[in-house]
Amino acid sequence: MAKLKITLVRSISKLNESQTATVRALGLRKRGSCVEQQDTPQIRGMIKKVEHVLSVEEI
């Protein structure tokens, strides 16, 4: 299964509560932080919800 490198490129201070919770559930805390996640439909759905603050690359 492929992996995704997810980077938080914008601040989460202006996001609503559910979007902030989604970013936290992805494992991101501060602007500029990166995580690697499995490429699953659940992760893709979370990315789509907050795609305007993320950068995503396939590994």
Swiss-Prot record:
GO-annotated biological processes: translation
GO CC aspect terms: cytosolic large ribosomal subunit
UniProt-recorded name of the protein: Large ribosomal subunit protein uL30
UniProt KW Metal-binding keyword: no
HAMAP family: Ribosomal_uL30_B
UniProt keyword terms in alphabetical order: Ribonucleoprotein, Ribosomal protein
GO molecular function annotations of the record: structural constituent of ribosome
PANTHER family noted in UniProt: LARGE RIBOSOMAL SUBUNIT PROTEIN UL30M (PTHR15892:SF2), MITOCHONDRIAL RIBOSOMAL PROTEIN L30 (PTHR15892)
Gene: rpmD
Subunit structure: Part of the 50S ribosomal subunit.
Family: Belongs to the universal ribosomal protein uL30 family.
Listed InterPro entries: Ribo_uL30_ferredoxin-like_sf, Ribosomal_uL30_bac-type, Ribosomal_uL30_ferredoxin-like
